[in-house]
From Swiss-Prot:
Keyword NADP: no
Transit peptide: 1-49
Catalyzed reaction equations: L-kynurenine + pyruvate = kynurenate + L-alanine + H2O; L-kynurenine + 2-oxoglutarate = kynurenate + L-glutamate + H2O; L-kynurenine + glyoxylate = kynurenate + glycine + H2O; 2-oxobutanoate + L-kynurenine = (2S)-2-aminobutanoate + kynurenate + H2O
Compartments reported by the entry: Mitochondrion
Record keyword Protein biosynthesis present: no
Pathway the protein takes part in: Amino-acid degradation; L-kynurenine degradation; kynurenate from L-kynurenine: step 1/2
Gene name in the database record: KAT
Protein name: Kynurenine aminotransferase
The protein's required cofactors: pyridoxal 5'-phosphate
Regulation: Competitive inhibition of L-kynurenine transamination by glutamine, methionine and histidine but not by tyrosine and phenylalanine. Cysteine concentration between 0.31-2.5 mM increases L-kynurenine transamination while concentration above 2.5 mM inhibits L-kynurenine transamination. Keto-acids as amino acceptors modulate the transamination activity toward L-kynurenine.
GO CC terms in record: mitochondrion
Length: 477
């Protein structure tokens, strides 16, 4: 207490001030150290909590189990590739020229209709005028009266028709037979519904000379072995994408007999139904004895009228099967665009008046595509590829393996050769195709690695450019 006794002297006051300053400095330093220590602990706690919180949120918002294992669609990747490198694009399946003018005019008229309801919601299961037109067409084609209100469903493209069919009929543990190669959405749609896909590949029965898509066949014993009490569904695609195979009556009868034996639903994806080349014939499996009651058939306005961007499709079949699709549709999409449905209805009404005439678009389109098919098959063979000549559709697969010495596959890192080939061709040669291994299940992807898929529904001038690009590439050192 010395500083109190010296309080009244100047020296004492100075000493007192110094001591007080020292005490204040000590207290201040200890306080700062304590505050710093607390702050450090607090920051660490925040970091730990933040890390735990982020991890918890990450786990909570992971992709649902029913979609886990799915990979990025080949279309997402290759559309981006085309946008970046700007090749001549023979990859995606769409025409690069205008659809029938009457369809475009009909859409403009519907959108500009004086009736305000023309641009409002329409009937959820299909615009009345469109389902009437679809009923009239398919009643003729399958030789039975189809009820437009209960046996036809209009969807957002054939994609949604497939989705509604699979979601509406496949339950947990149901087995679904898928023929390979297949349109790439089949497998993930089945898995998302809780189904178990069972695969069987089409394989060429010869390797030399001219190969037709008819030469790609199923092993009937292998197919029969896949059917059992758990089999709910088989998906067929005729005309086929990507091979262009048109299943003949004998092949369809094998499928039909197995479906009847095991009480299995047949989903027939027939979006290329009007693109069948002479002398081949498109046979609808629902017309075979005992098959109407167990078949859902899927079609597409995008393919029928060459209007892929309009995204309108449909399913038709017996009411007992269609009601399941309606339930999925009403709780997923509910209704499709009214003006587009109106325009497509006008398109069907136009073609129904001349259905048996060569001027009918459904009839003329196959002749137009056949010439393009023959030209592509010729120039692919000329440069050393071995094309499979399709019976229908507008795609062609070709074996490029004899040209592998002209391709530097080391520049790409993909696991599959056809991915490396198509990416290298896109970047280095300026021509884009699609890798067919994308259309196979994982165990069978090797079956597509030596092939590339090209679309020949393009302007003649662009097909000629493709031929020139390949000839130049083939002739380079």
């Amino acid at each position: 207490m010395m500083f109190l006794r010296n309080h009244n002297s100047v020296g004492g006051a100075i000493r007192t001030a110094v001591v007080l300053q020292d005490l204040q400095f000590i207290v201040s330093n200890k306080s700062s150290a304590l505050t710093g220590a607390v702050s450090s602990v607090h920051r660490q706690q925040i970091r730990t909590m933040s890390s735990t919180s982020n991890e918890t949120m990450h786990n909570k918002f992971d992709l649902p189990k029913r979609y886990q294992g799915s990979t990025k669609s080949v279309w997402v990747e290759y559309i981006q590739l085309a946008a970046q490198y700007k090749p001549l694009n023979l990859g995606q399946g769409f025409p690069d020229y205008h659809a029938p003018k009457y369809a475009l005019d009909a859409l403009a008229a519907a959108a500009n209709s004086p009736d305000p309801l023309a641009n409002q919601y329409t009937r959820g299961f299909g615009h009345p005028r469109l389902v009437q037109a679809l009923s009239k067409l398919y009643s003729q084609l399958v030789d039975r009266t189809i009820n437009p209100m209960t046996e036809v469903l209009v969807t957002v493209g054939a994609y949604e028709a497939l989705y509604a069919t699979i979601q509406g009929h496949v339950d947990e543990g149901d087995e679904v037979i898928i023929i390979e190669p297949f349109f790439d959405c089949y497998e993930p749609m089945v898995k998302a519904a809780g189904g178990i896909p069972r695969f069987i590949p089409l394989k060429p029965n010869k390797t030399g000379g001219t190969i037709s898509s008819a030469d790609w066949v199923l092993d009937n014993n292998e197919l029969e072995a896949l059917f059992n009490e758990k089999t709910k569904m088989i998906i067929i695609n005729t005309p086929h994408n990507p091979l262009g195979k048109v299943m003949d009556r004998a092949e369809l009868e094998v499928v039909a007999n197995l479906c009847k034996k095991w009480n299995v639903l047949c989903v027939s994806d027939e979006v290329y139904e009007h693109m069948v080349f002479e002398p081949f014939e498109h046979i609808r499996i629902c017309t075979l004895p005992g098959m109407w009651e167990r078949t859902i058939t899927i079609g597409s306005a995008g393919k029928t009228f060459s209007l892929t961007g309009w995204k309108i499709g449909w399913a038709y079949g017996p009411e007992a099967l269609l009601k399941n699709l309606q339930m999925v549709h009403q709780n997923c999409v509910y209704t499709c665009a009214t003006p587009i449905q109106e325009a497509i209805a006008v398109g069907f009404e136009t073609e129904l008046k001349r259905l048996k005439s060569p001027e009918c678009y459904f009839n003329s389109i196959s002749g137009e595509l056949m010439a393009k098919r023959d030209y592509m098959a010729s120039f692919l063979a000329e440069v050393g590829m071995n094309p499979t000549v399709p019976q229908g559709g507008y795609f062609m697969v070709a074996d490029w393996s004899s040209l592998d010495s002209k391709v530097d596959l080391t520049q790409e890192t993909d696991a599959r050769k056809d991915y490396r080939f198509t990416k290298w061709m896109t970047k280095s040669v300026g021509l884009q195709g699609i890798p067919p291994s994308a259309f196979y299940s994982e165990p069978n992807k090797h079956l597509g690695e030596d092939f590339v898929r090209y679309c020949f529904f393009k302007k003649d001038e662009n097909l000629q450019k493709a031929a020139e690009i390949l000839r130049k590439w083939k002739g380079s050192s």
